[in-house]
Amino acid sequence: NVLLIDGTGAAAQPGQTVIVQNGVITEVGPVKKVKVPAGALTVDGTGRTLMPGMIGMHDHMYYSAAGGRSAQMSYTGPRLYLGAGVTTIRTTGSQSPYGDINLKRRIDQGMVPGPRIYVTTPYLTGPGGGGTMSVAETPEQARRFVAYWAEEGASWIKFYTNISREAMGAAIDEAHKQGMKATGHLCSVTFREAVDLHIDDLAHGGMTA
């Protein structure tokens, strides 16, 4: 008897029954028309809303605090995402990439609760930018960076403001060869240049190049 938002853009539908078997939705319809299988575990949805899990496309597993400090949230982070209805996230830039990768593995193995995670590499920038971020001075360094993190389990790479066009192009090419995708918080490379280099996604569009 739940209010159902099905994610298609259709109006919310009250008084719906949703049947789930072995983790798969097998039937959806009005309470009076859908027969609940004998012995099924039931949840009374009266006064509740059911909708598909949301997908977060720009998320982090760390929390920035005053004074330039930050804290990794490997325990609370995934639980907070689930609590907000977010069942898939992309960590768009990581300060603790191994922490994110290991967390993803634990979630995938059912050891801890959390959303499906697409892990992004550490931020990749150019000389003179990004503080403790990884720096690629040459296209070859950029390729090696991507190949390394692909092997470690990252599925996206994120560029930061000082990356050069040449290093970025090489990294995107290598990422696509490795089955990865690329995004960027850009400045030294314009959005048009990034598109010409076949970047997959652009971050912070309203505040960068």
Set out the residue ranges of the language-model regions.
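Histidine-rich, glycine-flanked metal-binding segment
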Residues: 4, 8-51
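Short, flexible helix-adjacent loops and helix caps
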Residues: 7-9, 66-69
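Residues that scaffold the ATP/ADP-binding catalytic core of kinase and kinase-like folds
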Residues: 28, 64-65
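Divalent-metal coordination cores built from histidine and acidic residues
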Residues: 45-64, 70-186, 190-209
